[in-house]
Regions:
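Active-site nucleotide/adenylate-binding loops and adjacent lid/helix of ATP-dependent enzymes
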Residues: 105-194, 198-217, 221-244, 357-358
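Phosphate-binding core of ATP-grasp and ATP-grasp-like enzymes
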Residues: 175-229, 234-267, 271-279, 291-304, ...
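A conserved FAD-binding loop/helix module that cradles the flavin
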Residues: 281-283
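An anion-binding loop in the catalytic cleft
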Residues: 343-356
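ATP-binding N-terminal substructure of ATP-dependent carboxylate-amine bond-forming enzymes
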Residues: 1-114, 118, 133
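Residue-level detector of structured alpha->beta connecting loops
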Residues: 33, 72-73, 143, 177, ...
Length: 360
């Protein structure tokens, strides 16, 4: 179902998922006079406290989904593992953005890599693994070092294991429960970057400046903007992002993770949602990725992605959130706390953006 006309202030955006991304989407929507209705199964969802309404129910609860659909004007989501049946159920009743095609493509790593490669965009060598024979065939083709990942689910390093020359592929497959998988060749990259792009219902596209990302224990720690890469490399990455978002007939903000290896840009994966590596836009741009996503799904004109400051975004993980008082006192720091009840090890509890004058 398509959105017929732009949604005026006072309309309601439905959001599947109640984590920090939904929370920041709801806060951005409120600035535009739009209401948000959060649908999530967890009672302590951080987004509940900042939304006009919420429904706590399972994603499989069709009665609750039907009521939710009747109370909103458009539906979006904060995470890519929305059950396919849930997306299909809602898409028949209310506009869903991004649509199910993008969702289903990103949910399966083999389909995702096949789609990207089909556009002529470089990806790591890959092969599907479904049984012992296909594992042996994939291993013979890809070799080591390589990474075995579940085809579905998994983020921040979950659902994957590395294979080196002294480690059997069979043991790696056992580590991930012998689930359907993808074997990817290791990319000897120089830097990790991402592209944060938006596309509206009318096909307009806006692409932000490219962040350079640093991970610790498979979890994003910092995003530095501008990325310390050649201008030609950054422009190539932005063009790749535009190609992907257009080919998906996408509506909303997308995060595309990439590797830089020499002069080459290699796409790693797609996240059909606002993205952690785009949090810097909240304070270094006039229009953040969260407002941009709301604008896009509601049929509003896209805002300018222009950056007014250089910035380093740093995630606050686990107990690091207890440093909030010191961070709040720093004049060049913009602090964002997610309101989560428990600071578990590795859990994203907040982030801060450190701004400096724009140099380039």
């Amino acid at each position: 179902m398509q959105l017929a006309t732009p949604l005026p202030p006072g309309s309601t955006v439905g959001i599947l998922g109640g984590g920090q991304l939904a929370r920041m989407l709801a806060l951005a929507a409120g600035r535009l006079g739009l209401n948000c209705h959060i649908f999530a199964p967890e009672a302590d969802s951080p987004a509940f406290s900042v939304a006009a309404a919420h429904t706590q129910a399972a994603y499989s609860d069709e009665d609750a989904l039907a009521r939710f659909a009747s109370q909103v004007d458009v539906v979006t989501y904060e995470f890519e593992n929305v059950p396919g049946l849930t997306a299909a159920f809602l898409e028949q009743r209310v506009p869903l953005a991004p649509g199910s095609r993008a969702l289903f493509t990103a949910q399966d790593r083999v389909d995702e890599k096949t789609f990207i490669a089909g556009l002529g965009i470089p990806v790591a060598p890959f092969a599907a693994v479904a049984d012992d024979d296909s594992l042996a065939s994939a291993f013979a083709c890809i070799g080591t070092p390589s990474i075995l990942k579940t085809r579905r689910f998994g983020y921040d390093g979950k659902g994957q294991t590395a294979i080196s020359g002294n480690r059997a592929a069979e043991a790696a497959w056992a580590d991930i429960g012998k689930q359907p998988a993808i074997l990817e060749g290791f990319v000897n990259f120089d830097k990790e970057i991402s592209v944060i792009a938006a596309r509206s219902w009318d096909g307009s596209i806006a692409v932000y400046d490219v962040p350079e990302n640093h991970h610790e224990h498979h979890i994003l720690k910092t995003s530095t903007v501008p990325a310390r890469i050649a201008p030609e490399t950054a422009e190539n990455a932005r063009k790749i992002g535009g190609t992907i978002i257009a080919a998906l007939d996408y509506v909303g903000v997308i995060g595309i993770e990439m590797f830089v290896a020499g002069d080459d840009v290699i796409v790693n994966e797609i996240a059909p949602r606002v993205h952690n590596s785009g949090h810097w836009t909240m304070d270094a741009c006039a229009v953040s990725q969260f407002e941009q996503h709301i604008r896009a799904v509601c049929g509003w004109p896209l805002g300018s992605p222009t950056r007014h400051s250089d910035v380093v975004m740093t995630n606050l993980l686990g107990d690091e959130i207890h440093d909030w008082q010191r961070l709040a006192a720093l004049p060049d720091v913009c602090l964002h706390v997610y309101g989560k009840s428990e600071a578990r090890r590795g859990r994203k509890m907040g982030h801060f953006n450190r701004l400096t004058s724009r140099q380039a």
